[in-house]
């Protein structure tokens, strides 16, 4: 989590020993180049499908919400927002011992409703932009875990643009 991503956009190039969400997600970018042991193909296909779902958001606004050792020690939370689509993605990485963090999202329409989906827990909630900008709680059960969230302006809100 320490590198050029604080100054330049995500590159999507990495080498790793295992397919763990924490390591994989911290290296997503416009493209994906992997150096992996040939393991179960299904797992690799899942990683590629998840990265492809994230990819359109890398062309939007980038907000580093929490950086390790700042307001939430051990957490890094990044938001990529496509205001033109009313959608975005949030990556949360827990490297420390504090299993909870609050992330205040940016660039949302405070008066609109959004559907917030946590990929890891399969939970979806409807929440206002104002509430997401006031802070969404993020929880993991142990260090070196990540959470991936997608948000979409609700269909009725998007049709009223």
Where are these regions (language model features)?
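Active-site-proximal substrate-binding groove within the catalytic cores of carbohydrate-active enzymes
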Residues: 1-123
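C-terminal beta-strand-rich structural cap/linker in extracellular carbohydrate-active enzymes
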Residues: 127-161
